[in-house]
Amino acid sequence: MSIVCGVPLLECVYCLACARWVWKKCLYTAGHESENWGLATAEEFQPIPHLCRLILAVYEEDLRNPLWAPPGGYGINPDWVILRKNYEETQGRVPPYMIYLDHDNADIVLAVRGLNLAKESDYAVLLDNKLGQTKFDGGYVHNGLLKAAEWLLDAECEVLRELIERNPNYTLTFAGHSLGAGVVTLLAMVAVQNKDKLHDIERKRIRCYATAPARCISLNLAVRYADIINSVVLQDDFLPRTTTALEDVFKSLFCLPCLLCLMCLKDTCTLEEKMLKDPRRLYAPGRLYHIVERKPFRFGRFPPVVRTAVPVDGRFEHIVLSCNVTSDHAIIWIEKESQKAFDLMLEKDRIMEIPAKQRMERLESVAREHTEEYKAALKRAAALDVPQAYSPSAYGTFSEMGKGEGGGENSGRLSEEQVPILSSRRRRESWNELVGRLFHRDDSGQMVLRP
């Protein structure tokens, strides 16, 4: 009898806990996660609207007669498109993509489109992963996205190498949305580890812009590759915040209470310290740009503000209850709001009438600030005892790491036995040793990232 009487009490406690959780989730809207981040400048944010349009262009069948061009067009020259491949040509290994030689911006761009809800092959790539399944460069990555990135590099390395040889001063940029964002994230990391396939291109010439990315790399990799990988998130986008296995999310689409119950239990019972110290947990990659254009308990959209940081803790850890979680994932809205935000930045600079010389000085200052912020993120990761929050080796290949072998005396890569992920000696190393391994002083005495 006492047990029966206790059941309603347990139900009430559970309902109150769920109500509290829902209320907290509602408060996480309007950019709660990034409220303490710094504001992005026009110089660093400039490539993002243009790259969003390049990603949108991949959806077009005929770029000379576009059907879905945004206002002002895609801003590209069809004659500079090197190649395009569709699902039949990629055999479903990766979403359709395009290689574009951007002479206006001295850039070689590989753009990958997002998830196609009508293609089973895209789901196969996205759902091909289990917790702790695949290791890469001292951390963990999404298995399906890594295989797609490896296939893409093998397929196009000859074309990219030729373009890099013919244009030695151009940067190499990987850009993608949603599923494509995860592919280009892993592609950039594989390219850094296999620079010999790309005419030994310098690390500083490789860039990656992942718009609305899935959580695809472990925290140590997300911080260590923040100098080349940038993630763009529009306000309440669900995918960068989805910590539940994606397969479970798709299964729960027809049972929203089941999904909310699962997320409530996980968020309530999992300590943040435990999450940070789990080397298998995946995160949104690199430096984060958060576009915020709505305020809590307000209707309508406000002038967008872009905040940026390389966070360690509080890295989009909480899913948001909002009617915009899916619309904020759309590349069309991301392009529109990023362009609006960039125009506001330019207007502010015009009003301030910043001279050209000061613009150059500010650009150099932004580069220094990013380096300092990158170092601070590494320091924060070391302070929080994040496993492998350092660069174990500047050399090595993906195949060696995939096998978990040292690769011989001259491979330059440490074996799994030599550098265990939970090595207490590595985790207790001093901050000075960490900085010394990742940075060196140039001729002017400035601290710069090692190539």
What positions do the PLM features span?
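Non-catalytic, mobile gating and regulatory segments of ester bond hydrolases
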Residues: 1-175, 179-451
